[in-house]
């Protein structure tokens, strides 16, 4: 009897070990292979200028994906992030022009993101309304506010010091890249090293069990959506700085790109599973694919098809992983 249990426990251990290694680093390996292939076959891909451009291109999605990671890990998602990006940029531009104060404008943009996240979190956690319906509604509301505040037009920013947020270079790299790295580190530590992060994963794994175990589910969910709104607002402010204006029509459909990156990297749509390395892998893969398509002059319409296929593949892959875990 004991020999059976010993041999039975030995076999799964090695397979689990391999599965754990693949789960941790598999998509990073996929990115490495993709990167090498692009460096070989795509003209001008491996140049320093293009690498800086790639870093800038994924910086915004990297920031927003940090907040989306927590939403997905808790079993929810946030469809309002793209609208918050646009509205935060517009709000910042309008307030800077009205007050002639850079910091008041930035604070107003950040406050808008926090308030949007607070509304999402309260309605979802306290009123127990489905996250899809709630964030779909706030997506429309916030986008509408962006058009109302800007009168449907791009709002130019008169204070040129604001542009330094998007165009500053620190140690040879653009500031948005460093800010994205900082976001990834902070949110990674928050998820893996704090009680808040463990509570987030517990809620996503089994919300009722987490509640019975004493996890403050409502408070945790509200904080999660506030964080998502905050990082989306930061991304929107930096985007406005780089575009030298707040534009209400920007980042339409961006929420799907961010969700695709998270799920492609390995974050589960059902909740309870998520690591910052998954987000890094997902945004790097998506960013590399998009960069390669641009260098190859692939039609923008065809790029929509490719993005859709990647999203579909990510969802199918997530479904397969969940099914495989249940059968083990």
Curated annotation (Swiss-Prot):
Induction: Induced by arabinose. Transcription is dependent on the transcription factor AraC, the cAMP receptor protein (CRP) and cAMP.
Gene Ontology MF annotations: L-arabinose transmembrane transporter activity
Superkingdom, taxonomy of origin: Bacteria
rRNA-binding is among the record's keywords: no
Regions crossing the membrane: 29-49, 53-73, 79-99, 104-124, 129-149, 171-191, 220-240, 249-269, 276-296, 297-317
Cellular localisation: Cell inner membrane
Protein keywords: Cell inner membrane, Cell membrane, Membrane, Sugar transport, Transmembrane, Transmembrane helix, Transport
Membrane topology: Multi-pass membrane protein
Principal location class: membrane
GO CC list: ATP-binding cassette (ABC) transporter complex, substrate-binding subunit-containing; membrane; plasma membrane
GO biological process: arabinose transmembrane transport; L-arabinose transmembrane transport
The keyword Manganese belongs to this UniProt entry's keyword annotation: no
Family label: Belongs to the binding-protein-dependent transport system permease family. AraH/RbsC subfamily.
Function text: Part of the binding-protein-dependent transport system for L-arabinose. Probably responsible for the translocation of the substrate across the membrane.
Name by which UniProt lists this protein: L-arabinose transport system permease protein AraH
């Amino acid at each position: 009897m004991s020999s059976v249990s010993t041999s039975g426990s030995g076999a799964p251990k090695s397979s689990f070990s391999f599965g754990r290694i693949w789960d941790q680093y598999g998509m990073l390996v996929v990115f490495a292979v993709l990167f090498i292939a692009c460096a070989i076959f795509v003209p001008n891909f491996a140049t320093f200028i293009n690498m800086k451009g790639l870093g800038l291109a994924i910086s915004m999605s990297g920031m927003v994906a940090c907040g989306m990671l927590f939403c997905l890990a808790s079993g929810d998602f946030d469809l309002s992030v793209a609208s918050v990006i646009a509205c935060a940029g517009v709000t910042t531009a309008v307030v800077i022009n009205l007050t002639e104060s850079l910091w008041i404008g930035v604070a107003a943009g950040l406050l808008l993101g926090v308030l949007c996240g607070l509304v999402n979190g309260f309605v979802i956690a306290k009123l127990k309304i489905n996250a899809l319906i709630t964030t779909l509604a706030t997506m429309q509301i916030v986008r509408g506010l962006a058009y109302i505040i800007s009168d449907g037009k791009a709002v130019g920013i008169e204070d040129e010091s604001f542009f330094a947020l998007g165009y500053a270079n620190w140690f040879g790299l653009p500031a948005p890249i460093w800010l994205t790295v900082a976001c990834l580190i902070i949110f990674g530590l928050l998820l893996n090293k704090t009680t808040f992060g463990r509570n987030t994963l517990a809620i996503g794994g089994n919300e009722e069990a987490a509640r019975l175990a004493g996890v403050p589910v409502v408070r945790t969910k509200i904080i999660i959506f506030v964080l998502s709104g905050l990082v989306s607002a930061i991304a929107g402010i930096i985007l406005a700085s780089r575009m030298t204006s707040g534009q209400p029509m920007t980042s339409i459909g961006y929420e799907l790109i961010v969700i695709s990156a998270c799920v492609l990297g390995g974050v589960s749509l059902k909740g309870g599973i998520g690591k910052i390395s998954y987000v890094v892998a997902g945004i790097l893969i998506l960013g590399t694919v998009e960069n390669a398509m641009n260098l190859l002059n692939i039609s923008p319409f065809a790029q929509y098809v490719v993005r859709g296929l990647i999203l579909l593949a990510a969802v199918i892959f997530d479904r397969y992983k969940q099914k495989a875990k249940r059968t083990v």
